[in-house]
Structures are given as structure tokens and as C-alpha cells.
């Protein structure tokens, strides 16, 4: 059930950040996306009744257990280092634009 929920969240939102409220890396990714003016959905796993199940499903699906777990345009991006690295390489904004999360 958690896998289906995770997949539905990813497929119905241009950008999804699976996060935890106390995680500084999650905060960094959310701040970056906000600075870029991106529209994104945040799922705080520690605030969801099925957060643990969702995290297990994400680990099974992506091979990544840690948060943040970022998806853009239905594609798994990764965590904080991967997301910020893509931005530093100039690859994040085009991906966000293509996904419809930021205006071109």
C-alpha cells in the first residue's frame, strides 16, 4: 500500500521531496527549491502516520533510505548532495522547467 501511495504522490506532482522535519539536509533542499521559485510537494515522513512504511517503500523503489528523497518530473533525483550538485552544474533549473515546476 505504501509503495502505491509513494508512486501516486510522485506521478501526480511535478516535484516531490520526501523529508523529515528535523533533517538539516531536507531543509537545505527545500530552501533551494524555494529560492528557485519551484512549486513542490513536501511529504514529512515523521509527520505521516504511515511515514515509516513510506520510507521503506522508497528504499525498495529507489535503493535510497535516507532523506531528503527528491523526485522531479517523476524521476528519482536523489538526496541533498545530488540535488545541490545538479544545481551547481546548471542542470536543476532546466529539469524543474521541463517538469513545469518553474516558469521558463
From Swiss-Prot:
Name the InterPro entries on file. GLR_AS, Glutaredoxin, Glutaredoxin_euk/vir, Glutaredoxin_subgr, Thioredoxin-like_sf
One GO term in the molecular function aspect is: glutathione disulfide oxidoreductase activity
* Record-linked Pfam families: Glutaredoxin (PF00462)
Q: Indicate whether Electron transport appears among the record's keywords.
A: yes
Keywords of the record = Cytoplasm, Disulfide bond, Electron transport, Redox-active center, Transport
**Cited SUPFAM superfamilies:** Thioredoxin-like (SSF52833)
Q: Where in the cell is it found?
A: Cytoplasm
Q: Where is the Glutaredoxin domain?
A: 3-103
| Similarity field | Belongs to the glutaredoxin family. CPYC subfamily.
| Its job | Has a glutathione-disulfide oxidoreductase activity in the presence of NADPH and glutathione reductase. Reduces low molecular weight disulfides and proteins.
Any idea what this protein is called? Answer: Glutaredoxin
Origin species, per record, is Vernicia fordii (Tung)
Amino acid at each position: 500500500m505504501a509503495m502505491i501511495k509513494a508512486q501516486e504522490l510522485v506521478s501526480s506532482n511535478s516535484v516531490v521531496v520526501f523529508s523529515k522535519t528535523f533533517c538539516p539536509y531536507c531543509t537545505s533542499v527545500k530552501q533551494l527549491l524555494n529560492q528557485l521559485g519551484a512549486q513542490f510537494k513536501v511529504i514529512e515522513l515523521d509527520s505521516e502516520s504511515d511515514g515509516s512504511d513510506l520510507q521503506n517503500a522508497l528504499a525498495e523503489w529507489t535503493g535510497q533510505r535516507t532523506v531528503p528523497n527528491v523526485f522531479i518530473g517523476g524521476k528519482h533525483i536523489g538526496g541533498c548532495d545530488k540535488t545541490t550538485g545538479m544545481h551547481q552544474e546548471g542542470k536543476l533549473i532546466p529539469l524543474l522547467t521541463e517538469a513545469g515546476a518553474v516558469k521558463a
